[in-house]
Amino acid sequence: MALIVQKFGGTSVGTVERIEQVAEKVKKFRDGGDDIVVVVSAMSGETNRLIDLAKQISEQPVPRELDVMVSTGEQVTIALLAMALIKRGVPAVSYTGNQVRILTDSAHTKARILQIDAQRIQRDIKAGRVVVVAGFQGVDEKGNITTLGRGGSDTTGVALAAALKADECQIYTDVDGVYTTDPRVVAKAQRLDKITFEEMLEMASLGSKVLQIRAVEFAGKYSVPLRVLHSFQEGPGTLITLDEEESMEQPIISGIAFNRDEAKLTIRGVPDTPGVAFKILGPISAANVEVDMIVQNVAHDNTTDFTFTVHRNDYNNALQVLQGIAAEMGAREAIGDTNIAKVSIVGVGMRSHAGVASRMFEALAKENINIQMISTSEIKVSVVIEEKYLELAVRALHTAFELDAPAGNTAE
């Protein structure tokens, strides 16, 4: 008998029919002898519908009141799922984040979980009940309802698994696991049986949408075994593990991640003096713009060109700030480019194998793809390229690192 926390997202509970299917799946696990805690999101599209309603009142809704409003979406889903389970003869009870005391800070719309009081859930489990908990929400010390931001239900699931010391946290999605890359781009992408937390964290931060980065961070911090599974198909999914040895038989590179949400900014001809990076990035940070990759080139005339990347939706704001900085510092110009993308190779095998980066660069060179920026870590190499070459680059790297599935075994 195992204690399993199962999390189902909005698509998985998007209709009453799908909620009935989820109830069947939960019943199957319980009939097998497992204790089950279920975390669910609001039905697909419901959170957006509620936000749109709020914006009909105010373009910038008060965050506290917005949290009160959008948290109702999950309340509907938990009650429906509990009803579906009870109809099947499975004792079940539903709880909001407040009712199980998921304590968060007071950062409305983007709160972070501080503590969970697991006693109430443990009593229900002991009494033989399936506990259905609303994801995405909690309560602060003053009793105010809070929400965790987009993807917060994943974090709720992992946090509950940690608090309950569950044997596994299962994240159910519309894919049957973590793939070597997006199967929509590379038909020969393969599902990974196992991947390390480090690799998953890198892939999540680099644009992989399978798991939210906060959930992966939480799982790694509290050593919660994570498994990604398809909501309505049978299969082993992908186990995310702390043990690198379990991944030793995998290739050097576990996956190719990519992100189109990139923009590049450059300030040219800046006087090369101490503190130049802070003078540029300080105001950018103050404008709440997150900087990703950075490259600095020093010229012979004691000036420097400073280039960095940001999220594409921050581009206009960042360029406006950078133009002001250029005028203040006497730089030649501030320019930008939104026609870029980032491609990354990820794998713990890089630690013990030389020449991985050069192999990546060679594969791109063979396709005449120019590299504009490079960033590396122990288990990752990222490059910025022209966006129109993105899919070509991903396919070339997938083949170069021998990640293609054998003939007749491609992703569907």
Swiss-Prot record:
PROSITE patterns: ACT, ASPARTOKINASE. The keyword Kinase applies. It catalyses: L-aspartate + ATP = 4-phospho-L-aspartate + ADP. Its EC number is 2.7.2.4. Residues 265-332 form the ACT domain. One of its GO terms (biological process) is diaminopimelate biosynthetic process. Belongs to the aspartokinase family. This is Aspartate kinase Ask_LysC.
